[in-house]
């Protein structure tokens, strides 16, 4: 399968009513594309890092009533799961595609990672372009450009609030050429991940488990 992009019909998946119906569309339309894109990303990250990385595709298994408003793939250094580990995500809401370096609330070392990031704030500001965005909740669409964000406040919240999260990356609007053209999309993913790789590696020095 050639590198796929995501079309209008893929985004319309999130307009389908009913958990089973929406999940059926996610499995048939979106997850095969995630498999191809994710395998490419997994292999490239394994080469860049010199460690085996693993692809995970969100199954939304905990849901019993409400259908998911977004779906994603994740690449992490752990074979069994990704939520307790720093990881990269590529996924869709109904109006945009996101590429994240994600630190979500299940991460046991999030306090140490936040502390390390606060101590290395100048590095973050140097490495991450100002038009990249930060989210403090992976379940919400909202994200703020780094240039408009109080970085210290967001990292202190990540450190101090049990359910707080910190994700950094890029958004691309549905219908954009980058999203619909598979080669362009993969190049955008590569560029984003390479840009954020120093932060991923820094998080590992804070005691985050990789296996």
UniProtKB/Swiss-Prot annotation:
Gene3D superfamilies: Protein of unknown function DUF1054 (3.30.930.20). SUPFAM superfamilies: YktB/PF0168-like. It comes from the Bacteria. Belongs to the UPF0637 family. This is UPF0637 protein ABC2405. It comes from Shouchella clausii (strain KSM-K16) (Alkalihalobacillus clausii).
């Amino acid at each position: 399968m050639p590198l796929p992009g995501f079309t209008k019909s893929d985004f319309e998946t999130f307009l389908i009513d009913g958990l089973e119906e929406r999940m059926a569309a996610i499995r048939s339309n979106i997850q095969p594309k995630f498999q191809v894109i994710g395998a490419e990303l997994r292999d490239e990250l394994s080469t860049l890092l010199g460690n085996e990385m693993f692809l995970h595709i969100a199954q939304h298994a905990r849901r019993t009533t409400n259908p998911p408003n977004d779906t994603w793939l994740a690449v992490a250094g752990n074979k069994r799961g990704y939520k307790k580990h720093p990881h990269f995500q590529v996924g869709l809401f109904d109006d945009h595609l996101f590429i994240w370096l994600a630190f979500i609330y299940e991460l046991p070392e999030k306090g140490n990672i936040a502390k390390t990031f606060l101590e290395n704030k100048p590095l973050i500001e140097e490495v991450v372009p100002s038009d990249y965005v930060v989210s403090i909740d992976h379940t919400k669409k909202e994200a703020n450009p780094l240039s408009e964000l109080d970085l210290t406040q967001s990292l202190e919240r990540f450190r101090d609030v049990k359910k707080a999260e910190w994700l950094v990356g890029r958004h691309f609007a549905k219908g954009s050429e980058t999203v619909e053209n598979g080669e362009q999309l993969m190049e955008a993913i590569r560029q984003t991940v390479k840009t954020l790789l120093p932060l991923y590696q820094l998080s590992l020095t804070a005691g985050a488990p990789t296996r």
